[in-house]
Amino acid sequence: MKMKAGFFVAAMMVMTAMNAVPGFADRTGVVIEAPDAAKKGEAIVIRVTVSHKGNNFIHHTNWVYLKADGREIARWEFSSGKLPEGEVFTRDVSLTLASPVEITAEGNCNLHGSRGVVTKRIAIK
């Protein structure tokens, strides 16, 4: 019984240490790539690049969203059984502009949270 308790304590210490080290304990961050301006009625591609160190079944990005003027236009959900394909991955979304728009995106780590909301404004030419 003492051996099982000792193993459990050691395992918990290792997991705690791994999540305390910056290389392992990482918040999910996003970058938005899109044109600065587009013609009215033009379809544009918005690329969201997501980064998070150490995506694994315990510690991973669990969601990413993309909004246009506060309205969600895309959302990706992940879990321990459906992990992101890598520590850095991208998603593309097409959007037809009728007026200037403010694009926001955010991703979240299931243990450590988000690096915050990122914003990109797209003007009409």
Q: How should each PLM-predicted stretch be described?
A:
Residues V45-K53, D92:
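Short edge beta-strand/loop segments characteristic of extracellular beta-sandwich folds
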Residues G54-H59:
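A short beta-turn/strand-edge loop motif at beta-sheet boundaries
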Residues E72-L83, R121:
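Solvent-exposed serine/threonine-rich low-complexity stretches and specific carbohydrate-binding patches
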Residues L83-D92:
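Aromatic sugar-binding surface patches on proteins
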Residues N62-K67:
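Beta-strand signatures of extracellular beta-sandwich domains
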Residues G107-V118:
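Short acidic/polar inter-strand loop motif in beta-rich domains
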Residues A43, A98-E102:
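Extracellular Ig-like/FN3 beta-sandwich strand-entry sites
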Residues G23-I44:
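N-terminal edge beta-strand
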